[in-house]
């Protein structure tokens, strides 16, 4: 944050190097046989929308365009403002991951036909089994008007008991 204001040219040069290296790495992943790519932008929410549009969106486009036609591509931008989600959906990705701050009803209305993934707060997996089941079922019941991939709204926390992750998986698989 702030790098682009003071060192705009250098910030763009840095992003260019990052995207070039990442693109090369992801192409190797495809060559080695991955079935899907998922890009996590865990710091997306730290930038104001105008800076995200300047310093991130053009580079995401450069990264996604040559790959999304070859392999399914999921983009997850944690903390992204709702005003930017429709722009992300137009980058050519096959699905958008949502964190727990995005309202599922709003997302389905704003992004018709877009496959959505998420958005259970990972901290719920630290709760009791009853809470995990309840929160997971609630999440699943809210994603009814779109193609959907059940998942957490960010990465699993290191201290999450394996048994609790299994409860989440079992709840998703048994939901109807």
Positions of the model-derived regions?
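Charged helix-capping and loop-helix junction motifs
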Residues: 52-59, 131-135
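Active-site-proximal loop/short-helix segments
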Residues: 1, 30-55
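Glycine-rich anion/phosphate-binding loops
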Residues: 11-24, 127-134
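Alpha/beta enzyme core
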Residues: 9, 19-37, 57, 61, ...
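Catalytic-face loop-and-helix region of soluble metabolic enzyme cores
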Residues: 68-176
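Surface-exposed cleft-lining segments at the edges of enzyme active sites
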Residues: 8-18, 45-50
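Short, small-residue-biased leader/transition segments that mark boundaries at the very start
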Residues: 2-7
């Amino acid at each position: 944050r702030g790098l682009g204001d003071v060192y705009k040219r250098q910030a763009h040069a840095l992003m260019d190097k990052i995207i070039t290296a990442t693109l090369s790495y992801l192409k190797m992943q495809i060559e080695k046989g991955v079935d899907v790519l998922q890009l996590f932008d865990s710091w997306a929410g730290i930038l104001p929308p105008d800076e995200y549009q300047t310093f991130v969106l053009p580079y995401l486009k450069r990264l996604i365009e040559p790959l999304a036609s070859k392999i399914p591509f999921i983009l997850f931008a944690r903390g992204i403002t709702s005003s930017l989600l429709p722009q992300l959906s137009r980058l050519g990705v096959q699905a958008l991951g949502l964190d727990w701050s995005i309202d599922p009803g709003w997302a389905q209305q704003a992004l018709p036909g877009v496959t959505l993934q998420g958005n259970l707060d990972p901290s719920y997996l630290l709760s009791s089994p009853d809470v995990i089941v309840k929160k997971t079922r609630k999440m699943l019941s809210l994603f009814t008007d779109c193609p959907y991939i059940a998942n957490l709204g960010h990465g699993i926390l290191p201290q999450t008991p394996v048994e609790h992750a299994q409860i989440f998986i079992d709840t998703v698989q048994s939901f109807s």
